[in-house]
Amino acid sequence: LFNGLVFMPFFLKDVKCGDIRYGRNYYDYQEGTLVFLAPGQVVGIVNNGEYFQPKGWALLFHPDLIRGTSLVREMKNYTFFSYESNEALHLSEQERKVILDCFHNIESELQHAIDKHSKTLIVNNIELFLNYCVRFYDRQFITRSHVNKDILTRFENLLNDYFQSEKPQIIGLPSVQYCADSLHLSPNYFGDLIKKETGNSAQEYIQAKLIGVA
């Protein structure tokens, strides 16, 4: 059991060895899957009676490590920390090698004698790793375009039904949270998906829809 009260955890699974439980949900967590967890979350391995020998990589770091660095300001851009359990990153073999290179660089630096450059180099490698993950998530959005377009259609239908009902008078403008919940997605994943598919934020899309039906 991993308790992430003060750590930023990432897990890269190398073999099929059971599922990770995150709250009440289970990660879509097969070989070559990369999982991100927000601080304060508790995860565990599901015990179904079978014996597994877990194999993979985990990177956990205390927020104090990046305090006072440029990475602190960038963390808000890594929206995948708030994705739902079924929105994990599935790596290609080449992407997996890139990620492992980042892990090996961090591991090598941790084994090096500590000097005035240690923190900078470790943090820079963590930031490089996160930036690669942004790229790979962009690729995943593209390769799952047919799924994304289905979500976009459902979003459009949701807005049509909403504005044709009495909800605007009773509730007001639908929020991004409301739409994401209705589509069974996390707000961050939903927002990123809409931005990549339309070029507009989910909030901008809702505003444009309101103008269109006015």
For the regions a protein language model found, what residue spans apply to each?
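Polybasic "coupling" helices that flank or enter modular domains
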Residues: 117-120, 124-131, 138-166, 170
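N-terminal positioning helix adjacent to the helix-turn-helix/winged-helix DNA-binding module
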Residues: 95, 147-158, 175, 198, ...
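Solvent-exposed, amphipathic alpha-helical segments
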Residues: 98-112, 154, 158-165, 213
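Basic/polar phosphate-binding segments, predominantly the helix-turn-helix DNA-binding elements
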Residues: 173-212
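Amphipathic alpha-helical segments enriched in hydrophobic/aromatic residues interleaved with Lys/Arg
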Residues: 80-127, 132, 136
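Short, intrinsically disordered, charge-balanced linker/junction segments flanking boundaries
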Residues: 1, 211-214
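N-terminal regulatory/effector-sensing and dimerization cores
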Residues: 1-84, 115
